[in-house]
């Protein structure tokens, strides 16, 4: 049987369900596929096939994730759903499932619970741009005032973590009803269809990598006699053209130079684009002025920093991580893009130690500056062995 052709003409958006255990994330995920399939065709997924998500290894971390897809008028959605709370934590911190927006599922019968809060906090820390809310199990609540109260609580919680709680769309309904193809008082299929409309309206289309300012992590440096210095790497975003000025950022003082040529597979090109492995010839740059771990970037678009707040997941013993906890003053290496830099960890007040398998907010001070911005992912390593994964939540200096 021939594979169905992937529709390129619709914008592609990555989303995921977040929220407290048993509030209906997986049921809603299944309902979304059903409601969308009935309008736009495509397959709909049964609850069980999503709930028994296969485990994947992402950078040595075991994460169980279900991937489903569905469509709306304008868009093609790729949606991730995780069976367990720990899987969410790992997924969001490693960026294994990059989300352009999240669907927060909250039971109208229970209101916000501890993981509701934790997932909103995580979304803030890892830079999920937007949240749309589905108040689930509304068919179990007879009291209109109670629904309004829960909605108010959710909005306050979003505001608390710097999301625009007053403007976030909140759709009220029953995922189970929609999954069973029912629609009493518009709470089933209609509510889920409205949720899809809210995703369309409220989650902005992400800027494609090619349209962002140029950045290339430097992997290798060569000196070619008579030509100068060539740096190689994979262009992370943007385009670099021959003749353009770039900055070399990180590890040392920022330096400006000009790209006098771009090569790929030993052929000269006019430009290097996001996703391509290229060599860039730099004018007047000595072999010793550049090193692996720095980045080549469009001038003024990224700056070097040494102190930042991060959200870190510490690998469990089973994942090949540490067997023992660590304490404040812990000094591992932080692997950014292509290189390790040693740094010291400061733990939040009241946190004395961090156990393998935990996630923790920490402030890190590096011994050398790295080109960084909020949302940058890194690995925590000890002598080349990965013991954690993290994301820059906020740059301090």
From Swiss-Prot:
One Pfam family of this chain: GTP_EFTU_D2
Q: Where in the cell is it found?
A: Cytoplasm
Question: Where is the stretch described as G3?
Answer: 81-84
Q: According to the UniProt record, where is the region G5?
A: 174-176
Specify whether Iron is a keyword of the entry.
no
Catalytic activity annotation: GTP + H2O = GDP + phosphate + H(+)
**Positions of region (G2):** 60-64
Which top-rank group of organisms is this from?
A: Bacteria
UniProt-annotated binding residues for GTP:
19-26, 81-85, 136-139
- Tell me the ranges covered by the tr-type G domain, including all copies: 10-207
What are the start and end residues of every segment in region (G4)?
136-139
Provide the family line: Belongs to the TRAFAC class translation factor GTPase superfamily. Classic translation factor GTPase family. EF-Tu/EF-1A subfamily.
Function per UniProt: GTP hydrolase that promotes the GTP-dependent binding of aminoacyl-tRNA to the A-site of ribosomes during protein biosynthesis.
What's the protein called, per UniProt? Elongation factor Tu
The protein's organism comes out as: Chromohalobacter salexigens (strain ATCC BAA-138 / DSM 3043 / CIP 106854 / NCIMB 13768 / 1H11)
